[in-house]
Amino acid sequence: MTIVGHILGFPRIGLHRELKYALEYYWDGKIKEDKLLEIGRTLRIRHWKQQKDSGIDWISVGDFAWYDHVLTTSLMLNNIPDRHRIGQENINLNTLFRISRGYSLDKKLIPPSEMKKWFNTNYHYIVPEFVPNQEFKLNWTQLFDEIDEALSLKYTVKPILLGPISYLWLGKIKGKKFDRLSLLPNLLSVYQEILDILLSKNIDWIQIDEPILVLELPLQWLNAYLSAYEQLHGKVKLLLTTYFDSIYHQLDIITRLKIDGLHVDLVSNPDNIPLLHARLPKHWTLSAGVVNGRNVWKTNLHDWFKKLYPLVGERSLWIGSSCSLLHSPIDLNTEIKLDKHIKEWFAFALQKCYEIKMLCAALNAENTSDATYEDTLSEYYISNNLRSYSSTIHNIQVKKRLEHIDEISYSRSSPYTTRVTLQHKKLNLPLFPTTTIGSFPQTEEIRKLRSRFKNNQINKEDYHLNIKNYIKKIIMEQEKLDLDILVHGEPERNDMVEYFGENLNGFIFTQNGWVQSYGSRCVKPPVIIGDISRSKPITIEWISYAQSLTNKPIKGILTGPVTIMSWSFPREDMQRKTIALQLALSIRDEVIDLEKSGIGIIQIDEPALREGLPLKRSDQKQYLEWAINVFRITVSSVKDDTQIHTHMCYSEFSDIIYAILALDADVISIEAARSDEKILKSIRHVIKNLNEIGPGIYDIHSPNKPTQNDLIRRINQLLKYIPEQRLWINPDCGLKTRSWPEIKHSLNNMVSAAKLLRKQFYSS
């Protein structure tokens, strides 16, 4: 039996982020739809060829998406919220963008669908919406069109389809509550139709993704798998695909399914290969996800060879990535500035394809007693074996400081009830204080300035002078808007994680290591390669300068340790807890220096706190314990009258509400504008125990411009759950990606709405 290689998906954005720019040009009206479609087609053809040239046997089709793959699935199933059908006879590309971004109709804002994190990654998906008695039907033909494209180029095609049970689980109910599984029979009829079409195209295998099987699911959802795959089996061979965690707890159910193969993320749990082999039906194909799709380190191919070799000849075996390579940068060969010794430690998406080819070749060759491949695998990883001796990754002072971590208090010196009185006296803020989350528009001019400085085209003095001029403008604009708490706007920061990584020891940075976060939004995560420490203050110059320009309080913005770790590519030779503690000590030093410089409000952004939560509930308690302690170590040194804020992004806050309480931040702002009242309803039983909260009164990711009345309605909604003395008024996220005209309009209406309601409360 020949062992074949495949991947679970390939990055779609393009080596130079071509898809990002094409989407933004299209949204801005700078290119037509036919040009956008042409760019997408060019990217797909290039990516298929790259996979084939790298030695991949089955070419994945269906991983390309104009915004995200879950939304693509919704369109294929004709699951379009009624508010996005208005004025549109047929589903088209603009329908997709309406759902993901929102739009205006007759001066009325039509909100986008909710956006959520894709499991425990920094990728986001647009949440499907379900109503009682909803009917699905086959509509959007993107998958079939792309299969035809690939077949015309003579590739061996493996279509990718999000499975029906996971699709239902990932969605949300709109309106009256009902059992989402009641929609399954109708949904399965559409999936059968899809499989019939694939059969007519002579498709042999389909990758059907059911990632929720790694969760600890209710029994009725597990039982739904049995009937669903009984119904779907027999048309095209089904490779049931799971990722991001182990599925050993579900083997009793999985082994009863009518499928033809199973993909398992072995990176998450590599030690149970013998158990898998013993438990899975002998006629099934086992797809071994051994190349990490979520990190950039080389794979220890020789180690995997030894683990997988006993299966050779015993069953049908595929070698694959642990998950989609969507979460990986594309090509290491473009990183011409990386130190060559450090570069040898890494593998990006194309190199990961080559790793799969190498492992397949070695396992296949072993069938013919050719052992030379095994030596090649050992040589491939030798640089990573030597890494543990590198002075680049070790810092004795950091290790010594960690040894004494228990000497640091995990708590503020006084409880919130004491602190709040001192803080209110010092800050003298009105009811419904207004602020922003931190960043202001990153104009082309600012980006060019940073690029020129990075490329040594201007000196440090000129760069600092220009950045301070931008800060001055940002302060002036905020004062004109009459915001209560100001920020310096972060013009010096390219990215909230990359900026801090650049100013800490233990990180390296890529030129082209971009990965998609959502839609056209891409991030370039730094790589943590060694022990982390702070050599000098990072933000003091900019934030202190901002405070010198105004009598209003300036809020210093820092990225928190858990988020820096989660949004970087972490070390694989160190536990996440230890990495986070190293970061906590570094950011703690910055907090101390900010307070010494006279900054009385400090915000520690932790948007990734929920994201880092293990997928299995039984594993979550331990993570939350150390994540909470990491945050508290970061801020425990400050005085009682220093106000500590934190900010969190798209999250199921009900899952971690007690952890949020345990952070003991004075003010928390959350990204909740897309969620209507859902988040507040889910935590209403503990809101009385929260300190102060700013839920976000408008969605900055949508181009919609909220009116004053829109914002008043939103604030009144919030007041049903939050006492007025504890409610802050703010956008739901940073303003980096918006234009100045947009934010002036929205913030002016936000401040006006707060003032109007403030007046009503003071006079009542």
From Swiss-Prot:
- UniProt key word Transferase: yes
The record lists L-homocysteine as bound by 437-439, 490, 605
Q: Name one GO biological process term.
A: methylation
Q: Where along the chain is 5-methyltetrahydropteroyltri-L-glutamate bound?
A: 17-20, 117, 521-522, 567, 611
Cofactor(s) this protein cannot do without? Zn(2+)
Matching InterPro entries, A to Z?
Cbl-indep_Met_Synth_N, Cobalamin-indep_Met_synthase, Met_Synth_C/arc, UROD/MetE-like_sf
Q: In which pathway does it act?
A: Amino-acid biosynthesis; L-methionine biosynthesis via de novo pathway; L-methionine from L-homocysteine (MetE route): step 1/1
**Entry keyword Transferase:** yes
Cofactor binding note: Binds 1 zinc ion per subunit.
PANTHER family (UniProt xref): 5-METHYLTETRAHYDROPTEROYLTRIGLUTAMATE--HOMOCYSTEINE METHYLTRANSFERASE
Q: Which family does it belong to?
A: Belongs to the vitamin-B12 independent methionine synthase family.
Q: What does this protein do?
A: Catalyzes the transfer of a methyl group from 5-methyltetrahydrofolate to homocysteine resulting in methionine formation.
- Spell out the protein name for this chain: 5-methyltetrahydropteroyltriglutamate--homocysteine methyltransferase
Tell me the gene name. Answer: metE
